[in-house]
């Protein structure tokens, strides 16, 4: 059952945000199981209450799907004093800064283990929608607290904000190992603050966060409406900024659009550089898929890459999820990934783009690219330029539409299906060792899919 738990958490990691998974799923440990229940160990009572409220059904679902049968979960708190009276989390969040503290000495903590090893600048694909944020992040990583401070990066879910935040941390730790770097989500900041209040260790908490050289905070919008957390983060921000320490923050919204955020915090977020990340365009999605398939060693044919990239999704995480899904199906079934297999597997997610592309559209675009007329593609002229353009158009019709060989032939001047098959196979063979032809077809596909 331990293996089932491990597989279930791996599945959750693929669909949850980096910060949520690291904060709330990673700290949970498998204990034991019986016929109906899986017993899991959590670090604190507050953590248990949070999981009960926000993630219990998620965990039950993940375990049950992975195991192939329904399981319940039982959360066990791993604390020495489980009977101690614990204040309500909301009370702590609102009144936290008024709590009595016990002086505790602590050295600033350098949190490198929380950095995702997969999120580096080398593995980040830069495109028109993210190149400004990418350049700003690299500038900060190479010269912390010297260029843009704070750096505020905002954009929609799954567009690469966490990737850039982690990449900054990796670069600074590699080039300046003497600097203390802490990466955490705003949710984790609140959770650790509440824990410190309950244990009366706010001095230790403040010493940790206010003596850093670099603070990287993900999803700052989480502190919206949380008065006590905003108060504590305000003083943490001031302490670091006054000491000229680097602060980088991400959010799903522009500072002015974050609701229930104190004006003094909002204005501080706007002191430095604000960089946005836009959804990737077609070219960037293609580059991302090629990079991810290389990293994961999932063999993804060119036509499948274009099929995925042309989907309506504007979320990089969803693209990665589709890639992983195809890779898993291919591995489990022992079959290669093909365009037909991808269409069948992902039809509920992205539908079938073939209905949007017609033979006439392909003929029009190919003719324009070769400086020909559409009638030339339908003729029987044997000039080399005509023949190649006609074969490419037929190959694209086979690849990008639902038409049968006879239907395609009918639209190319009444050619029979054997002629269509021959033309398509001719291009298949040529693509294996003709990079120039590959680029021509890639360019035409980009036009068709826009």
From Swiss-Prot:
Q: Which GO terms describe its cellular component?
A: cytoplasm; plasma membrane
Q: Name one GO biological process term.
A: regulation of DNA replication
Start and end residues of each stretch annotated as Domain III, AAA+ region: 114-330
PROSITE patterns linked to this entry = DNAA (PS01008)
Q: Is this entry keyworded Ligase?
A: no
Q: Which residues bind ATP?
A: 158, 160-162
List the residue ranges of the region (Domain IV, binds dsDNA). Answer: 331-450
The answer, when asked if Transport is one of the entry's keywords, is no
Q: Which keywords, in A-to-Z order, does the entry hold?
A: ATP-binding, Cytoplasm, DNA replication, DNA-binding, Lipid-binding, Nucleotide-binding
Q: What SMART domains does the record tag this protein with? A: AAA (SM00382), Bac_DnaA_C (SM00760)
Q: What does the entry's free-text domain comment contain?
A: Domain I is involved in oligomerization and binding regulators, domain II is flexibile and of varying length in different bacteria, domain III forms the AAA+ region, while domain IV binds dsDNA.
**Protein's recorded name:** Chromosomal replication initiator protein DnaA
């Amino acid at each position: 059952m331990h293996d089932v738990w491990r597989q279930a958490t791996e599945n959750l990691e693929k669909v949850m945000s980096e910060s949520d998974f690291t904060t709330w799923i990673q700290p949970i440990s498998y204990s034991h199981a019986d016929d109906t229940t899986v017993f899991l160990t959590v670090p604190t009572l507050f953590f248990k209450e949070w999981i009960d409220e926000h993630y219990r059904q998620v965990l039950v679902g993940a375990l049950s799907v992975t195991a192939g049968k329904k399981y319940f979960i039982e959360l066990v708190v791993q604390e020495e004093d489980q009977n101690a009276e614990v204040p309500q989390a909301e009370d702590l969040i609102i009144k936290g800064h008024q709590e009595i503290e016990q002086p505790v000495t602590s050295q600033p903590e350098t949190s490198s283990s929380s950095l995702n090893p997969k999120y580096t600048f080398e593995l980040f694909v830069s495109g028109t929608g993210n190149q400004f944020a990418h350049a700003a992040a690299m500038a900060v990583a190479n010269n912390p607290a010297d260029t843009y401070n704070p750096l505020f990066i905002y954009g929609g879910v799954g567009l690469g904000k966490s990737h850039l935040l982690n990449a900054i941390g990796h670069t600074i730790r590699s080039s300046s190992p003497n600097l203390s770097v802490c990466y955490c989500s705003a949710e984790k900041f609140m959770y650790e603050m509440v824990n410190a209040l309950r244990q009366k260790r706010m001095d230790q908490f403040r010493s940790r966060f206010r003596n850093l050289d670099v603070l990287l905070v993900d999803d700052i919008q989480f502190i919206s409406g949380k008065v006590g957390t905003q108060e504590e983060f305000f003083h943490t921000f001031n302490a670091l900024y006054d000491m000229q320490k680097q602060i980088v923050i991400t959010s799903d919204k522009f500072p002015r659009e974050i609701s229930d955020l104190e004006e003094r915090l909002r204005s501080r977020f706007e002191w430095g550089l604000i960089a946005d990340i836009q959804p990737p365009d077609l070219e960037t999605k293609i580059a991302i898929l090629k990079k991810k398939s290389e990293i994961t060693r999932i063999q993804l044919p060119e036509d499948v890459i274009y099929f995925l990239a042309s989907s309506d999704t504007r979320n990089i995480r969803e693209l990665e999820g589709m890639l992983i899904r195809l890779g898993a199906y291919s591995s489990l079934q022992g079959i290669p990934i093909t365009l037909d297999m991808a269409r069948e597997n992902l039809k509920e997610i992205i539908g079938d783009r073939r209905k949007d592309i017609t033979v006439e559209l392909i003929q029009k675009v190919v003719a324009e690219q070769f400086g020909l007329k559409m009638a030339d593609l339908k003729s029987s002229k044997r000039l080399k330029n005509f023949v190649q353009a006609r074969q490419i158009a037929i190959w694209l019709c086979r690849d990008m539409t639902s038409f049968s060989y006879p239907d395609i032939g009918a639209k190319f001047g009444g050619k029979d299906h054997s002629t269509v098959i021959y033309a398509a196979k001719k291009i298949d063979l040529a693509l294996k060792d003709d990079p120039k032809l590959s680029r021509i077809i890639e360019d035409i596909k980009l036009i068709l899919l826009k």
